């Protein structure tokens, strides 16, 4: 009888209910907060990668027409010292500058080797587009792409998900200096 009476009094008692609610909800709220933080961090890194690829493509699309051996491929254009403008474009993508000294990477762990730059052509023999390189019917596009394996803070593992692999891509038509 006393056990039943004690159980009824505990059931009706509301002293300490806030402590119990807090103990139950705190882990759930911390997990939600951590997940929101992790996903926002991934989106932030993606925007940095997109900005880097965009900047690199724009830079190489405006590279001067100094082609060795009469080649008109902007991916093969070099400066007076013989350095490929493509190398400078990769540095701009990763560091935000043509020089790597004194500059930090936009995203930690992202290297110039992760950036791929190609210069595919498209046919302009019909003359529909302004010819920026005389003597050829091909127009060039500058395509910069990258892939980055995002190191996780651990919340993806809680959900049994693998960390995302962030990719970014930007394309510009080669227009030369101006």
Language model regions located:
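Alpha-helical hydrophobic helix detector
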Residues: 18, 22-37
